[in-house]
Amino acid sequence: MELFDTETGALIVIELAMRPHNSAHWTIEGALTSQFEQHLRAVLDYPLGVTTMTAPVVVMANVLAGPADVRPASIDERVHHCLAAWPDVKIHLYGKQFRPGRKVGHVTASGPDLDVVRGRARSAARYLMNGGELP
């Protein structure tokens, strides 16, 4: 289920997906049982797994192909720098063809502090998108 949180605090249902959804890719590292495993368990009529979060805060940030990404190697080179700069951030690239603005992956960061975790995820995604600044 995809929800939007409005300025008034109301939640609006945007989409119901009866499959793993990109808005819950954070569960790969952020939950004891990912949405992918949970989906398989449900389809196979197995007991559902524990969905406890692996950290108090888990943030996923999308990686969009930047205007300079005319070849995948440019983002591949940035992955190496990103892994060194943010060793606790997990990077997932989807192997999609690169077009400016297209979602080509995501990063996930976790930890105890929302502002710190959000900053790491956004910084890593921004760097992967356009070679922004390293810490």
Positions of the model-derived regions?
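Short, glycine- and charge-enriched coil/turn segments that flank and shape catalytic ligand pockets
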Residues: 7-9, 68-77, 112-119
